[in-house]
Each structure stands twice: as structure tokens, then as C-alpha cells.
């Protein structure tokens, strides 16, 4: 099962130069709690944006068309969505999708759960989530994040679950 996780500002911004354009420890903690010891898929630009931080305690799948792309020990490279879907059929674990926007969009039909952090602020950046069709999803959970000295932006966490098809 694919689970997508992203944070976005008021305008749907999700990134700047491969990184998050804001500092929000609550969201980073939320992401870490959900993805620790899990399989994480991301695009090359997202992976490169992390630099050597390559998220320890996770197995990372990097999607790229570059045939000779090098990754850290806890990562592997796949070259297409079709290759990823074939890979996913052979494993029982959930796969967490962490960006970028084209990968979120491409995997939306296969996504069963979306965890979205909405940040009530506007930032500068270069990557937007784009239009996400939530009509086949249901908002099943939502809670406000704590605003304090470390977490200066109002934010809320949402869990969207794909609705079962009615026959």
C-alpha cells in the first residue's frame, strides 16, 4: 500500500531547492514517527536535496531516469513508476511517498492514505503539490499542531483515506 506524506503552505508550496522552505519541528517529528523503519520512495531531486542526511533507519527508493545514479547504503534506485509498482507487489510493507510533486501525482491512483500537513503561512519556493483530486478520499482525522517558540506557524495534520468503491 502506498501512503503519501507531505507538508504544504497556503499556496500548495512543498519545496525549495529540494528541501522544505520552512522550519517546523512538529512536522518533522510527525514525519519521522510515521516513516521510521519503513520504506520511503522519493524522486532524485528530493533525495539530492537531503544531501548526506539520507534519512537513517529507513530504506529509501530513489526514482530517477539516470541509469548511473549513486545512492547511500540504505537506498536503491528504480527507474520508473512501473518498476516501482512491480517492486511493491512483492513486499507486504507499506511504502511511504515523500515527493516530489510528480511522484505524488503519478502514484495518486495507487495511494490509499494521504497524510498532509497544512501550514497557515506563505513561503518562497519552486515546487508545488499541484492539483490533488480528493474526491475519492475521505478526511478521517484532523488535529491542530501546537504553536510555540520552536513551531511558529499555525498548522494542522490531516489524514485522508481512499474510500472503498461501492459496487
UniProtKB/Swiss-Prot annotation:
GO terms for biological process: dihydrofolate metabolic process; folic acid metabolic process; one-carbon metabolic process; tetrahydrofolate biosynthetic process. InterPro entries: DHFR, DHFR-like_dom_sf, DHFR_CS, DHFR_dom. It catalyses: (6S)-5,6,7,8-tetrahydrofolate + NADP(+) = 7,8-dihydrofolate + NADPH + H(+). GO terms for molecular function: dihydrofolate reductase activity; NADP binding. CDD domains: DHFR. GO terms for cellular component: cytosol. SUPFAM superfamilies: Dihydrofolate reductase-like. Key enzyme in folate metabolism. Catalyzes an essential reaction for de novo glycine and purine synthesis, and for DNA precursor synthesis. This is Dihydrofolate reductase. It comes from Enterococcus faecium.
